[in-house]
């Protein structure tokens, strides 16, 4: 039988999924520790061995082998723009949507100190924006010159004011910098245009980054490392929400991905105001939006999760005021491979997951603000209104292994005690039990209809 082999070179595990193309089913899944320090193929070969054992007795012909990766720290970027709330924020959103970890966002004219900071950062790509089309020219030219003069040699995606793109190209050509020019991330005030920059970032990731991270060994076995893992998850979520010409999507949805270091939230919805008389304010929101909370994680970021939430919030979800939450979080940060075994450990992990879901969702969704005027109260919305989203999908180890995944995801739903945050009110909850989201994002590149049908079949309602 013809099958696709879909790989995710994760930061901790290398995960393999074999998909029967004809019958639209998962044939087998396997995983092993990612071995980025030595040779990434060592961990892959161990996982592949486990996979072939499961496929014993079946005649499987892998017609395509596709991969995504977040190994070696994933795709690390910085964004540079003009105004923090506008072009710098638009650049950040483009980078996040491309599946990157955004290490920093710089605005206005770069200083010598900032450029040295950029130069010494462990980065993969710089996204340079600034000014609307026909707007401010000086800032982007200044920043391009600064990067060139300080000898920055990282790949740069230029996605700012189109009027200065020729001049910026000239600066980078003279300095021998690898760059790509694409459309402005904010061509008009408050108007987002992130897709061209996302695609350019993905192309550079495929060509340059995979090689730089010592992953070219894998390229000989597979057809290509197509994108960073978070971009694959976002792609899967998008095709599931929107559907294809031949297969209906399920409509607006949210994906919550709780990991050891971060909690990612992906929303696929236009987020327009659902209540009458509310006006939108601020930067336009993308239909496919991703936010990453680097301080909300189950292991690496356990201490920062406690610092961000405070003792009281964790104790609220634990329903126990006697637990030393600081000590429990510190232990997890120091023992990142810890697997909870006792009832107390499981309860504490689930309380952490609830805090991560609650806070990550709070930061992702829009807010309603009231303003008093002589005409009465006026309500404005900043960000996305996700009140009416009917589907929330959870993924990540703590959710997959939990006996109460629905309770964890409920922590991210609308709360009357905090009615200004526009979290989903009455959604249905699903779990990605077989870790297929990133795999389906890869499959959707070739066979989107099948990817949608497989997700509908394998996502488990809780």
Curated annotation (Swiss-Prot):
Any Pfam family: MutL
Domain of life: Bacteria
Function: May play a role in glutamate fermentation.
Name the record gives this protein: Protein MutL
Organism: Clostridium tetanomorphum
